[in-house]
């Protein structure tokens, strides 16, 4: 799942920053913003993923001997920040095709639900809640460059 974040209310600051900075500086500052934002998103997301009271009952089930060693909320992966041009992207959470490897394949069913369980949507809720903190990080980094 991918969520695009746009910083609103910072238009004037971003324009001043973009006119004063080179493309390399813009890319570096945006990378710093993404790096500082990853733990914020991870912290918020971990509070939104439900945890079972007994970890032994988590995971595949159905008589399977494989079980997870920790709750998904405690093992949210953070990817490496990628810079593309002057923009930067950060991955927080599981890749769609690699959830099996981390033992948290079923976390997708928590978010989107099944025919038996209603969705407990946490991905978009995390993005909405993290928005203010990410805006503050971006504002601080842009202002620090201009000062």
Report the location of each language-model feature.
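Short, Lys/Arg-rich flexible segments
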Residues: 1-90, 96-147
């Amino acid at each position: 799942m991918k969520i695009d974040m746009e910083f609103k209310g910072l238009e004037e600051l971003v324009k001043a920053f973009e006119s004063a900075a080179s493309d390399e500086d813009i890319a570096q500052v945006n990378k710093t913003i993404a790096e500082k934002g990853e733990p914020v998103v991870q912290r918020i997301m971990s509070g939104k993923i439900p945890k079972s009271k007994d970890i032994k009952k988590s995971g595949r089930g159905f008589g399977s001997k494989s079980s997870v060693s920790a709750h998904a909320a405690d093992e949210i992966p953070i990817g490496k920040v990628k810079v593309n041009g002057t923009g930067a992207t950060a991955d927080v959470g599981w890749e769609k095709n690699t959830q099996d490897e981390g033992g948290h394949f079923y976390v997708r069913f928590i978010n989107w639900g099944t025919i038996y369980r209603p969705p407990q949507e946490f991905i978009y809720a995390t993005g909405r809640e993290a928005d203010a903190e990410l805006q503050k990080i971006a504002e601080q980094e842009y202002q620090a460059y201009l000062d």
